[in-house]
């Protein structure tokens, strides 16, 4: 993935971003794509979806026209046969050698990964946590490759990907990084998911909480809950007699979520796929639901199940407009309407847009 972007001075390039050539026009394209998918797959106009027709930048990305935000807290570098650092060209295995990545967050750039050769490595992923000084590199050796001596410009934990089973193993330092969001610290283990933009987690929590408006004693579901970001946010707002059930399919993410939320005894995390675990819980009703499914969406069967639980509000977090629109149509068939939809540019200079849709029963206006 490497699409060169002419920076304001026309002399520098940003690599590994889709649609870099659109530059300032990128958000307008995101708006057009989202509007098109809502109409085509859900039959919704922006007004019917409660969307103001804008894609909002994250806090800190409101830069002068032509400026490029340094936002990626996680960058996976490709290594060529000579051990040089680069990024893969878009839809290609070819490696474009770079000396810097302008969209890398400062904590990643300060590691100086590009300054070192990485013989016998296939990729080097650099991570800089938000809200802590944790930094990490994850090395993927070529077949039979030996790990190099890692000498970077900042202290860093080192992990490696096993070429046989794909597992991620600690070499030295911590096997996790500590991220901050919503005044809580979240442990994110090796290979675990966390939003790449430094402001994304807080931005999404605010949007979800403003839409759900949790009340004391609410019973809530957090589906595809990851390391517990939304479960933690809801759990802090529903009082001691409230309850949150989180469901997550990733074993390591479940371990992290249980660790992260151990101070909230009203929160329980279950391991497994949502479409398998949820029916087994015996839950027939709840007050709130938040779901942040993978790119393919939740799907018809899961949406049908959720629509039957009578939730007062549902928050749907999506990174793919098409999957969101399909599932919104399923929710409409299940008796729900979209109250509001907000779109955020949490992947600047790429074709991705993050959305938060708030739904409520069509028969109500709460």
Residue ranges and their predicted role:
Residues 2-7, 16:
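Short linear motifs in low-complexity or flexible loops
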Residues 32, 38-291, 302-304:
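Accessory RNA-recognition modules of RNA-modification enzymes
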């Amino acid at each position: 993935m490497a699409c060169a972007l002419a920076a304001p001075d026309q002399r520098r390039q940003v690599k590994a971003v889709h649609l870099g050539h659109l530059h300032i026009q990128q958000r307008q394209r995101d708006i057009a794509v989202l509007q098109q998918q809502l109409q085509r797959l859900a039959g919704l106009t922006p007004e019917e979806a409660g969307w103001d027709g804008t894609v909002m930048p994250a806090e800190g990305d409101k830069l002068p026209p032509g400026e490029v935000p340094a936002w990626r807290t996680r960058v996976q570098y490709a290594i060529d046969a000579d051990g040089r650092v680069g990024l893969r060209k878009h839809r290609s295995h070819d490696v474009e050698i770079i000396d810097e990545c302008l969209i890398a967050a400062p904590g990643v750039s300060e590691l100086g990964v590009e300054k070192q050769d990485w013989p016998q490595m296939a990729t080097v992923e650099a991570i800089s946590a938000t809200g802590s000084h944790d930094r990490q590199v994850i090395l993927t050796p070529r077949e039979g490759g030996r790990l190099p001596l890692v000498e970077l410009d900042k202290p860093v934990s080192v992990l490696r990907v096993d070429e046989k089973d794909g597992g991620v193993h600690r070499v030295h330092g911590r096997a996790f990084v500590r991220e901050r969001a919503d005044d809580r610290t979240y442990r994110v283990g090796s290979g675990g998911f966390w939003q790449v933009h430094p402001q994304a987690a807080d931005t999404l929590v605010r949007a979800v909480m403003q839409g759900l408006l949790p009340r004391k004693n609410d019973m809530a579901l957090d589906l595809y809950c990851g390391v517990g970001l939304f479960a933690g946010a809801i759990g802090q707002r529903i009082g001691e007699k409230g309850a949150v059930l989180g469901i997550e399919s990733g074993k390591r993410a479940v371990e992290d979520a249980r660790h992260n939320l151990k101070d909230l005894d009203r929160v329980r995390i279950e391991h497994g796929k949502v479409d398998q675990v949820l029916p087994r819980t015996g839950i027939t009703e709840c007050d709130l639901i938040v779901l942040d499914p993978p790119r393919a969406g939740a799907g018809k069967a899961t949406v049908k199940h959720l629509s039957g639980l009578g939730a007062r509000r549902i928050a749907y977090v999506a990174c793919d407009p098409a999957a969101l629109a399909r599932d919104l149509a399923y929710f409409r068939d299940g008796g729900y309407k979209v109250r509001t939809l907000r779109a955020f540019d949490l992947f600047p200079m790429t074709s991705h847009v993050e959305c938060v849709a708030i739904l409520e029963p069509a028969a109500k206006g709460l």
